Amino acid sequence: MSTTMLTKETVERKWYILDAAGKPMGKTAALAADLLRGKLRPDYTPHVDCGDYVIIINAKDAVLTGKKLEQKYYRTHSGYPGGLKETQYKILMQKKPELAMRLAVRGMLQKNTIAQWQLKRLRIFAGAEHTHAAQKPEVWDR
């Protein structure tokens, strides 16, 4: 029996929905990263982008454990002297919960070109409604 290796042409991608309501942001992001990479597929091939599409709903209801809401900061730098901007995660979760979830998922992907392609297959919505009903996504409940 020979091992089957996926190629770019033979990958069949599915759409999955993850509900982040009441769940820790890190666990939801880790599961999303595994689905985007294809690690949970039986035909996973490391050198081929074989991941699926992931829709995360209720991002505004995701939970940060511990004191992260007050102690964790989102930092950006413009490149100029004095150009550091810091935003507390409590404010970030109120204004842009999609960005907070995207940053968590991005941090759990590999740091290479394939990860950029995988991140394009991630869709995040703050509420329970999403715009991808035509793709017939499956709810991930394992």
Which residues are covered by each model-predicted region?
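Ribosome large-subunit tunnel/peptidyl-transferase-proximal elements
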Residues: 1-103, 109-113, 131-142
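Internal, active-site/partner-interface "lid" segment
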Residues: 117-134
